[in-house]
């Protein structure tokens, strides 16, 4: 009959320091707890010990490496390596002192650190490697079939490292198990049952009562089949493809024993943004929901039956069960009654285990872990590259720094691109105001998911204060911007204080307005307009101006007035025209000056007066056809008006030849002496 022996070694202590009295251990495939609800991060062994030493203290044992060995016929059949999580010193007897310890994997160290941090552009194996190495765990490996895409933004939020690892592993369909070797244990991550290790020798089934065998065997095996979900459907949404449904489906197999048409599992959001991830997540969800559809439980004395190992069963009466199985949970019991030698009992050393199996071709999936929910909005600061004031992408998204992020340098690498809520957002219309670097913003999270931040508001603080002092200007509503890479601002503000109501508009440089139809303005009091430089106005058709009172105009330079058709002026009373030097009137064909009572031309003491009594010519001398020449004027020299927006100005018209006034004067004098009409209009009036 096979002989059993249990040994335990602790780092830095002699190998024979402890003897094992008994142990109870459990191991699970990528689970966080046992069937009884106890916490178990891979495996957990409670071991009762004895030692002839009475001076062993916690500092000699706790957090040290430890190894439990199971010997069969003098050879190590199984070893469990880990660290000591807890240590108990019990009673001191005549020859022995009693101790107890808890053996767990080094992975459990991750349960002792809670953190909040952001991982960017890293895939799951990279994130896990960081978590493990930060805890000094270097014995880990990945055996994966699927390619894992980098996650743009992955947040560990107020959760322990182990909870974070469990959550991500379950989301991505990763399970972990352990490979135990002398003096170490390796954490193995896999995404398929095909990648898990298999025992080298088949295990026989022996349920005969009283059966004796030196080789370990399985003594009990019961299979279980139950109805489970037959189909999963997941949906999600991405603002980059707003009209695409992102719906993915997965269908179960080996379901002949159950109905399939009604057992659909639908969930949204599925937490994916592309079809490739959606398909994988759907299958992972279905595998989890159907993981208990086909299971088996059993008992054995084979110490190598550990969670995460496959084995071939043989010699079962039901040939269908002689297949490859995967251990997903096991409980181990060992008792060594003769460990205390003279104080021990007479019983034999015994070992047994109980286990749960699934067919090895089925992928076992860990239970999805709850994702931390952000209780409400957070405060963050907009960040970007050094020297920039505004930093955004083509969607108007910005980067932010959260106060709780201890790993961020508060720059363009502090977060993913975060969408910004705008007051109105349509297709090529709406409002846009990009938060600038240094602004404090309010960040909410879609569905409470810390991986999906969105800016929903902005706030002032002690450094970034409002445009006007408060509460003195509490009646103002202000929209003020700030000049980018300069000083100044644009502003539209409203004053609502009774009696002082005002709409104020300030443009730091240009102010452009385009109105595609009518523009009506009604000012019920005064209007003041001051232009420090030029003014340009272009009217494509007509211009009408009505002034009920006076109209005054002061022009300190030249004035050009061009009318390309007729020009009509009508004055109800006095029309007075005064020129400091010269008045020049020219007509291309004729000039008519008509008065109802009198016309007078006067120079010094000489004058010509035309009235109802006749024509009066008075001068120191009157010359008729006696030589001389007509006087000349400077003529028209006006400039063409420039068009708005600085268009090229037209060339000024050529200067006109002055009129020969002397000849016209002689003609007038001659006509006056003869009593003849001086123009066609006069002839018409005389007739």
Where are these regions (language model features)?
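A generic structural signal for residues embedded in beta-strands
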Residues: 68-69, 313-314, 442-443
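Short, well-ordered loop/turn sites that connect or cap secondary structure elements
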Residues: 60-61, 305, 435
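Assembly/oligomerization scaffold segments
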Residues: 1-117, 171, 293
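Short, basic/aromatic beta-hairpin or loop at an interaction surface
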Residues: 30-46, 275-292, 408-422
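Extended, domain-scale alpha-helical bundle/helix-rich regions
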Residues: 92-93, 122-141, 146, 154-361
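Acidic, low-complexity/disordered segments
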Residues: 307-309, 319-380, 456-462, 467-477, ...
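Short alpha-helix capping/helix-loop boundary micro-motifs
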Residues: 46-56, 290-301, 424-430
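Structural signature for extended repeat/solenoid scaffolds and their inter-repeat hinge/linker regions
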Residues: 171, 189-190, 260, 375-602, ...
């Amino acid at each position: 009959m096979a002989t059993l022996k249990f040994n335990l070694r602790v780092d830095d202590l002699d190998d024979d320091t402890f003897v094992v009295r008994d142990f109870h251990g459990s191991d699970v495939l990528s689970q966080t707890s046992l069937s009884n609800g106890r916490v178990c991060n891979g495996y957990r062994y409670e071991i009762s010990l004895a030692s002839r030493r009475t001076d062993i203290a916690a500092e000699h044992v706790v957090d040290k490496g430890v190894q439990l060995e199971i010997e069969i016929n003098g050879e190590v059949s199984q070893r469990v390596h880990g660290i000591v999580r807890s240590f108990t010193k019990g009673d001191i007897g005549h020859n022995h002192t009693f101790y107890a310890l808890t053996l767990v994997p080094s992975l459990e160290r991750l349960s002792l650190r809670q953190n909040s941090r952001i991982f960017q552009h890293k895939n799951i194996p990279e994130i896990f490697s960081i978590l493990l190495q930060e805890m000094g765990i270097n014995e880990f490996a990945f055996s994966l079939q699927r390619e894992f895409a980098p996650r743009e933004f992955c947040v560990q939020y107020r959760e322990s490292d182990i909870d974070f690892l469990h959550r991500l592993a379950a989301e991505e369909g990763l399970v972990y198990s352990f490979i135990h070797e002398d003096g170490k244990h390796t954490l193995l991550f896999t995404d398929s049952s095909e990648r898990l290790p298999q025992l080298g020798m088949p295990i026989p089934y022996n349920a005969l009562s009283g059966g004796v065998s030196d080789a370990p065997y399985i003594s009990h095996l019961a299979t279980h089949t139950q109805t489970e979900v037959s189909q999963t459907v997941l949906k999600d949404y991405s603002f980059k493809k707003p009209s695409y449904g992102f719906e993915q489906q997965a269908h179960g197999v080996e379901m002949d024993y159950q109905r399939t048409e009604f057992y659909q599992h639908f969930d949204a959001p599925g937490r994916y943004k592309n079809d490739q991830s959606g398909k994988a997540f759907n299958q992972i969800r279905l595998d989890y929901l159907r993981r208990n559809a086909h299971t088996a439980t059993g008992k054995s004395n084979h110490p190598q039956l550990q969670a995460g190992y496959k084995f071939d069963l043989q010699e079962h009466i039901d040939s269908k069960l002689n297949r490859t199985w995967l251990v997903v949970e096991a409980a181990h019991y060992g008792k060594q009654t003769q460990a205390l030698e003279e104080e021990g009992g007479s019983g034999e050393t015994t070992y047994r285990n109980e286990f749960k199996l699934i067919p090895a071709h089925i992928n076992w999936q860990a239970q999805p872990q709850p994702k931390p929910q952000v209780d409400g909005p957070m405060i963050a600061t907009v960040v970007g590259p050094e020297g920039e004031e505004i930093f955004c992408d083509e969607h108007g998204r910005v980067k932010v720094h959260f106060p709780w992020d201890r790993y961020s340098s508060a720059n363009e690498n502090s977060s993913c691109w975060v969408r910004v809520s705008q007051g109105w957002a349509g297709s090529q219309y709406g409002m846009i105001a990009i938060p600038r670097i240094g602004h404090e913003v309010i960040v909410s999270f879609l569905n409470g998911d810390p991986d999906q931040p969105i800016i929903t508001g902005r706030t002032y603080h002690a450094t970034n204060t409002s445009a006007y002092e408060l509460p003195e200007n509490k009646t103002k509503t202000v929209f003020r911007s700030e000049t980018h890479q300069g000083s100044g601002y644009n502003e539209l503000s409203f004053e609502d204080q009774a009696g002082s109501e005002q709409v104020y508009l300030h443009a730091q440089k240009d102010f452009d307005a385009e109105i595609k139809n009518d523009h009506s303005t009604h000012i019920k009091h005064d209007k003041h307009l001051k232009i420090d430089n030029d003014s340009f106005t272009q009217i494509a058709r007509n211009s009408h101006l009505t002034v009920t009172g006076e109209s005054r105009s002061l022009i300190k330079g030249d004035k050009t007035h061009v009318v390309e058709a007729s020009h009509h002026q009508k004055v109800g009373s006095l029309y007075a025209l005064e020129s400091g030097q010269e008045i020049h009137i020219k007509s291309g064909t004729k000039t008519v000056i008509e008065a109802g009572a009198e016309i007078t031309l006067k120079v010094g003491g000489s004058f010509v007066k035309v009235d109802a009594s006749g024509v009066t010519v008075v001068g120191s001398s009157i010359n008729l056809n006696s030589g001389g020449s007509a006087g000349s004027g400077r003529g028209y020299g006006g400039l063409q008006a420039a068009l708005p927006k600085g268009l090229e100005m037209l060339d000024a018209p050529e200067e006109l030849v002055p009129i020969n006034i002397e000849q016209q004067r002689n003609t007038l004098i001659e006509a006056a002496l003869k009593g003849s009409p001086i123009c066609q209009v006069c002839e018409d009036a005389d007739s």
